[in-house]
Structures are given as structure tokens and as C-alpha cells.
Amino acid sequence: MKIIKTADYNEMSKVAANIIAAQITLKPNSVLGLATGSSPIGTYKELISKYENGEIDFSDITTVNLDEYKGMPRTNEQSYYYFMNDNLFDHVNIDKNRTHVPNGMAEDAELECKEYEKLVKSVGGVDLQLLGLGRNGHIGFNEPSEEFAKETHCVDLTESTIEANKRFFASADDVPRQAFSMGIGTIMAAKKIVVVVSGADKAEAVKKAFTGPVTPNVPGSILQFHGDVTVVCDAEAYAELEK
């Protein structure tokens, strides 16, 4: 595991975007695993800039997203489908038919999980997976629990995750209580993983996940067992590692 300390959010975003741009350049038909939330927005802005400057080409890229709120229609601005279009897909030359996000409105949750897992395998698996890290150490919507969930599954969101996500909604009551998420096994099957983490409120999670014991109570800690992980932190998120 390689942990890179950067000065601030902007530098963190640039470093992460450079790693992804290199992947696209070296393998133009890469499968990218993508994340949502505030952490990767800057990375996506940098990728859009690189595309506009003619540095990278998304025309042969396939994407699979980590997660989606259960019961959230794709037209809702808080859906991760909407987020991805708004923050990346609408601004680059990607084929929308090759962008995949779990269907939050699927009537059969169990079937949707199985189908999404099949989809990830059918595109050849993930070449590079972009992740954020939750305050409670979650990756995707894999919350702290008794065991690591292996495959795509439907998960109950913890109070801390609902609290963290309520800033995107009118109130905490509007935050969905469940989500579809790639499992830890699905994430770990990616050939390369890049984690972006920023802010002082993530510093404790960084320390626990990347220097503490590997435990399902801190889902991100499993990344210590992956052979090719780069964690890109801003100075605030890195702070606990310097103590």
C-alpha cells in the first residue's frame, strides 16, 4: 500500500486524476470502478479538464459504479446515476451504454445484486477502482459489521452514514435507509485501487483503516491485503499518521 500526502484537496484530486489518466492511456478500453460523494468530485473535474485538453479519450472506457440508494429514481438529483452524469459522463466522450450504476428502483433487490455482480464479471472485472473512505471506515456502502460482505448486496445504512449524507438532502429524514453496494470481495478483485481522502474528520478513519488491524468493523482496513493500492490524502486527512 502506498500512501501519498498532498497539500490540499486540489492537489489530492490532481494526483488521483493523473493515476486514472495513466490507466486510460495505457489501456484505452479499461473498466473503471467509480465512486460518488464529495471526495472524488475534484478528481472528476481534473479528468474532464484532461479530456478537454485532448490528453485522454473515454470512447472505449467502460464504468461500473460502487453503489446506489435503494428506492431512488435515476431522475432524482441525489441518485448516484444522476451524480455521475452531472459530474463526469455528460462532459466527456463516454458511451453512456457502457456506464453502469445499480438500479435503485429494482423491484427484486436480491436479483439486482446478482445481476450487477454478473455484469461486473461480464465486462472483464475492474482494472482500476476509485474509492472514498467514510468517517466510520466504510468503502462503498460496506458498513462496519461482523463480517466482510463478499458480493454486491443490499445494505442498511448506519446512523453515522445517514448523518454524513444528510447535507445532500433537505433533512436526515429524506436520506434513504438502504443502498445497493458492491461487496468487499468485488472491490478487492479490482486490479488496481485508488483511494481519495480529504478533511480532518477523516483523519482517524485513515489511521484505523490503513495502519490498524484488518477487521470488518473498519471495512476499509481490508485494503491492506490488496497488492496495488494507492491512498491519496490531503494534509488534514493524513494528520493522524504523523503522530
Say what each PLM segment does.
Residues 2-115, 119-122:
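N-terminal active-site beta-alpha-beta segment that forms phosphate/nucleotide-binding
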Residues 4, 72-78, 82-86, 90-243:
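Conserved phosphate- and dinucleotide-binding cores of soluble alpha/beta proteins
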